[in-house]
C-alpha cells in the first residue's frame, strides 16, 4: 500500500499511498451490505432490498465511510512501516476521492520530530545549591506566625500605620459614617487619609481635606472633600508570645513547631534548588542544539499561549514577538526531552500514572477522581499528566548524569 516516502524537510515527510481497486471495491460492497441490513426501503422487508437499490440510494454514503476507513488504516500501517514519529495528524494536500474500479491513490504530508545527530547530555554543569536552613530563617517564620495569629487590642497610644481605628466622619458633600472600621495604610481611601489619622488618639476630633483621584471609590472620585473625623477607638495588633505560639498552632511544644518549620523550609529549598538545576540543564541544551522546528507544532503552541494571554486580559498585538519566541522555545524543549527520553528508554507505566494522580490528590486535598476529571476536561485525555511524569523522569536522568559544581566554581 505504501508506494514511497519523500522527505520534504527535516520535519516534514510525504507519504505516497495506493490501495488496489479490488480492495476498495470489496470494502464498498461490505459497507453496502451493512447498510442493506438496516435500511428501510418502501416495498421491501428490512434487509431484503436489492443491493443495486441500496447502492443507488446509499452509494455515496458508503464511499465516504470507506474512504475515511481506508485512509486512516493505510496511514497507520505506513507510519509503522516507515517508523516515523508523527507529531500531528496528517494533512492531504489535494482532495482524496474514490473512483470506482480504480486504485485509491493519495499523498499525506506528516510533520515529524527532527533527529539530532550526536545528542550528548552527559556532565552538564549544574550548581550545587545549599538547602541548609539557618536559625534566623526559622526565627523569621516564628515572628511572622506570631504576628499573623495575633489579635487587635485597644490602645491609648496615638494611631500608627497598620492600626485599626473606629471612626465617625462627616463631609461637606453630605456623606457620613458611624463606627467605620479602617486599617491605616490599607485603603480604600488615599494615603493622605491614613496620614491624617496617624498620631491622633482616641476621642480626638479634627478636620482634613482630601483630594480623591478619578479612579477612587465612587462617592468621592475626582473630588476635593473636607472631612470632620472623630477617633472613637484605636486598636493595635498584639503578637502572640512565642512561648505560646505552639499551642495556638496545635503543636506539643516549641521544639516540635521549630522542627516542623525547619522541615518545611528545607523541603521548599530543595524544590527550588531542583527547579533551578532543571532550568539550567534545559537552558544549556537549548543553547547547544539548533534544529528545524515543526511549523505546525509551533503554531499550535502559539495558539495555546495566545489564549493564555487573552485570558489575562492582555493585548496580544503588543506581545506577538514574545509569544512566538516562547512557543519556539517550548517546542524545542519538548523535542529535546522527547529524544532524550527515547534514547534512555523512558516510559510511563499505568502504575506510575495512578501514583501521580494520588500524589496530586493529596497535595491539593481533592479526590483522585477530581484529578482525572480536571485533566480529561482539558483535552479529553490524560496525555498532559503522562507527559509531566515522562518529563520528570527524563530530568531525573539528566540530573544523575550532570556534573555538580559548588557556587564559587560556577562559571
Swiss-Prot record:
Give the EC number.
5.2.1.8
- Write out the GO MF terms: peptidyl-prolyl cis-trans isomerase activity; protein folding chaperone; ribosome binding
Q: Which Pfam families match?
A: Trigger_C, Trigger_N
Q: Which GO terms describe its cellular component?
A: cytoplasm
Q: What class of enzyme is it?
A: isomerase
Q: Does the keyword Cytoplasm apply?
A: yes
Does the keyword section mention Isomerase?
yes
Q: Where in the cell is it found?
A: Cytoplasm
Against InterPro entries, the record matches this protein to:
PPIase_dom_sf (IPR046357), Trig_fac (IPR005215), Trigger_fac_C (IPR008880), Trigger_fac_C_sf (IPR037041), Trigger_fac_ribosome-bd_bac (IPR008881), Trigger_fac_ribosome-bd_sf (IPR036611), Trigger_fact/SurA_dom_sf (IPR027304)
Q: Which residues form the signal peptide?
A: none
Provide the function of this protein: Involved in protein export. Acts as a chaperone by maintaining the newly synthesized protein in an open conformation. Functions as a peptidyl-prolyl cis-trans isomerase.
Family of the protein in this entry:
Belongs to the FKBP-type PPIase family. Tig subfamily.
Comment block on domains: Consists of 3 domains; the N-terminus binds the ribosome, the middle domain has PPIase activity, while the C-terminus has intrinsic chaperone activity on its own.
Q: What is this protein called?
A: Trigger factor
